[in-house]
Amino acid sequence: MKRTKSIHHASFRKSWSARHLTPVALAVTAVFMLAGCEKSDETVSLYQNADDCSAANPGKSAECTTAYNNALKEAERTAPKYATREDCVAEFGEGQCQQAPAQAGMAPENQAQAQQSSGSFWMPLMAGYMMGRLMGGGAGFAQQPLFSSKNPASPAYGKYTDAAGKNYGAAQPGRTMTVPKTAMAPKPATTTTVTRGGFGESVAKQSTMQRSAAGTSTRSMGG
């Protein structure tokens, strides 16, 4: 009987330890996961142009100008391209489109097609850009061009979006926000023209995915 009683005590101690150590282990794991998430995020500022950046960062005018010019070049390479001005205006609004440089990412056959139909192809103006904090350290900083539509019918209306259609909120420069580091990664060059309304569809899909991800995160945190 004593032996049996000893076995029962041992089982109880093991069971108690398992029940009480498991939450601790989970908590430690959660802390490391949260730390990993924090490291994967980056604080960025949103500016309309180099002057906005310089005003917010006195003494950093040269860096602001460099970031702005780099963002313009990136916009030429990655912005949605349209075969006609009308298609671009339908998406982004009057006065928001420009002729794109022939070498701006487009494949030669698509350049020829666009040039045959209208003499050139079109892209939206860069409405602003995201820029990593100047005091963030490391070898320089990253920037990402942003676009915005002035057509109320477009899903991108009044919003800052990147070339992939991801939404970064209201098109109001001067804001600071936290984004995943992947948001600042260079986007692939645009190699084909977009049909009318195609970019808006991308923005709508991205917004749906963002809302879904936010909802899942909220439910997970709430248990």
Swiss-Prot record:
Transmembrane segments: none annotated. Residues 178-223 are annotated as: Disordered. InterPro entries: Biofilm_formation_YgiB (IPR009576). Residues 204-223 have a biased composition (Polar residues). It holds the Pfam family DUF1190. Residues 178-195 have a biased composition (Low complexity). Belongs to the UPF0441 family. HAMAP family: UPF0441. This is UPF0441 protein YgiB. The gene is ygiB.
